[in-house]
Amino acid sequence: MSALTTRLAGALRDRVLSLTDTTRPEGPVFLAATLGTELAKATRLAPLEKLCKPAIVPAALTLALRDGELAPVDTALLAATGAGYTAGDVILMLGDGHANRSTRRLVAGAAAFGAGHLALGAMMLRAGIRFRPLQASIHGVAAGTASAVLLAGGRTNAPLAAYATLLAALSALATSVDESAGPAAAVLTVGGPVFLLSDALILVRGRAPEGSASARALDVGVIDTYAAAALLLLTGTAAAARHTRAS
């Protein structure tokens, strides 16, 4: 087993334990919010989704912040990320979520998420994480492919193509993390690609027949991957910032 695999396995185990720690509320709240949103998507219970989905990122943010020891700037950047992601959730949720085919609403949601990505990327850079050539190249190909697919649907998709490029850049930076950021930051190598997968599933969901079993399964898959990615990116970046500050 490689050193990276060992660090990643340990960091993921710690994340799971934090979710099941009943001595503090944020882990169980994160699980409840995620499971409630999955149930809402599977059963089309919009009121349940409106109750649960906006709590996913704030719970993940609380998990990321609870160990303290962050510089004020990093705390502000992490909070800005959480605010951007939550705003994006609400914008998309009020527009019928992943089933929405309105480019205008998708662009508005992407703008909110994009602001969160920029804040998180700035925090990663402050923690000393730098792009590595292989990761940047792989994600560059992914960004180019996604942009081509989106632009093939019309020039109105240009903002979404720009968002795809931004997310790919964030994932490239996250997967460039190394041992200098500390063992707990290893989850970033998973968080970035999982966020990419979540957004790719949204594109696939937009082409699924409304009300079909495949559409519902994709909706649940989007929530699964999004919640996991948000948790790993927020907590992993916070861990990297703490380690760098303590070094």
Give, region by region, the residue ranges found by the protein language model.
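Short amphipathic, positively biased membrane-proximal segments
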Residues: 1-247
